[in-house]
Design a protein with these regions (language model features):
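PRY/SPRY (B30.2) beta-sandwich protein-interaction domains
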Residues: 1-185
Length: 185
């Protein structure tokens, strides 16, 4: 347990990097730090979502990470500008939640394994093959989604939905684990 706490503290220090985080594209229940990288749900029983201010498009692979700072449920992934902020509840956003479920189009399917406080979640979008995949504490969980081609023709944004927890985003690197050649969003 002490090693996990030390690793989480080291990861939090590494994630203190600058970068463009979440701005105004968020629910009223989502509190955002001054640098836009620390996000907190202000309600224990309601989802609060937000999208990063900058998206990605075109070829290549993009990756971001988050450290879950407190108990609660986090869902992280990628979304288009037209997506609901409740990530994965429409056909414009893709999420993977701490309950071990991936979501797209309001369909929740088992994937990977649960995660929570102290875990680092890596989130990758590869435009070369249209895939979204995840890492938990540096361990690849495999491909979660194949993005429909029409969505690959628009910018996609790092996105989170939180219920009763806080996370720290790392949108600039260095990353704990990322696919070879992955770039920050």
């Amino acid at each position: 347990a002490a090693a996990a706490v030390a690793a989480a503290a080291k990861a939090a220090a590494a994630m203190a990097s600058s970068g463009v985080g979440v701005g105004d594209d968020r629910d009223g229940l989502l509190r955002v730090s001054g640098d836009g990288l620390e996000l907190t749900s202000s309600a224990a029983n309601a989802w609060a979502g937000g999208r990063a201010a900058l998206g990605v498009s075109g070829g290549g692979c993009y990756h971001f990470e988050l450290l879950q700072l407190s108990p609660g449920i986090c869902r992280a992934g990628w979304s288009g500008l037209a997506a609901k902020l409740a990530l994965g509840t429409d056909r414009q956003g893709f999420g993977f939640g701490g309950t071990g479920k991936k979501s797209f189009g309001n369909s929740f399917d088992s994937y990977g394994e649960p995660y929570g406080e102290g875990d680092i979640l890596g989130v990758s979008l590869d435009y070369r093959d249209g895939s979204i995949s995840y890492h938990k504490n540096g361990v690849p969980l495999g491909v979660a989604f194949t993005v429909p081609p029409p969505l690959l023709r628009q910018p996609l944004f790092p996105a989170v939905s939180l219920k009763g927890c806080s996370v720290r985003l790392n949108l600039a690197g260095p990353f704990a684990a990322a696919p070879a050649g992955a770039l920050p969003p």
